[in-house]
């Protein structure tokens, strides 16, 4: 949230599965929300306020934003079948997950598969059209998807995980 106006602070609301879970009022325009996420799909909104003595005057609510990520991700490589199996922990509220792979940490991701929320496992055989290479590090991104009204929305996520294919 940017504080381009003369406001005294911001009020944040956090929702899980459409239900209000927490309201936080901060004088700062930034808020660390990693502790709130903890394996949940969270929707949040924010509004500014101005202190007028004993009373606060609130502005309009922003639109909803969504965030969430898996708290635990594991990978295992089967050298006979040359497949990487990736498993992850449940994200509460997720309806499906989109799994992508890249050879770089922050770009070049190629979609592997979208799986239902109950599955939480994917087998990766290739990066694009090429087989996985021994000794190469691959970056896996798991994006939870939630239902927002009639739409399926991909959550913003900070969850990118690396896995190095063994050389043996």
Residue ranges and their predicted role:
Residues 7-11, 41, 83, 94-98:
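Exposed beta-strand and adjacent loop surfaces of beta-rich binding modules
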Residues 1-5, 55-93, 151-168:
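Pro/Thr/Ser/Gly-rich low-complexity, intrinsically disordered linker/stalk tracts
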Residues 11-38, 98-134:
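Recognizes extended acidic, P/S/T-rich segments that occur
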Residues 41, 83-85, 121, 137, ...:
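Intrinsic-disorder/low-complexity, polar/charged segments enriched in Ser/Thr/Lys/Arg/Asp/Glu/Gln
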Residues 1, 12-14, 44-46, 88, ...:
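An aromatic-rich alpha-helical recognition segment common to small helix-rich domains
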Residues 23-26, 44, 71-77, 86, ...:
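Generic structural motif
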Residues 5, 16-19, 52-54, 92, ...:
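Solvent-exposed strand-loop boundary residues in beta-sheet-rich modules
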Residues 33-56, 127-152:
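Beta-strand-rich modules
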């Amino acid at each position: 949230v940017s504080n381009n106006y003369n406001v005294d602070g911001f009020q944040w609301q956090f929702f899980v599965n459409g239900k209000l879970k927490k309201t936080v009022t901060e004088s700062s325009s930034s808020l660390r929300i990693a502790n709130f996420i903890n394996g949940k799909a969270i929707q949040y909104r924010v509004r500014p306020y101005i202190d007028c003595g004993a009373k606060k005057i609130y502005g309009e609510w922003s639109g909803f934003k969504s965030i969430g990520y898996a708290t635990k991700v594991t990978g295992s490589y089967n050298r006979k079948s040359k497949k990487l199996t990736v498993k992850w922990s449940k994200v509460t509220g997720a309806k499906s997950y989109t799994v992508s792979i890249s050879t770089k940490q922050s770009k070049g991701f190629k979609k592997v598969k979208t799986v239902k929320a109950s599955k939480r496992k994917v087998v990766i055989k290739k990066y694009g059209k090429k087989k996985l290479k021994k000794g190469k590090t691959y970056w896996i991104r798991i994006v939870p998807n939630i239902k927002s009204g009639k739409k399926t929305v991909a959550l913003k996520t900070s969850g990118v995980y690396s896995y190095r294919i063994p050389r043996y």
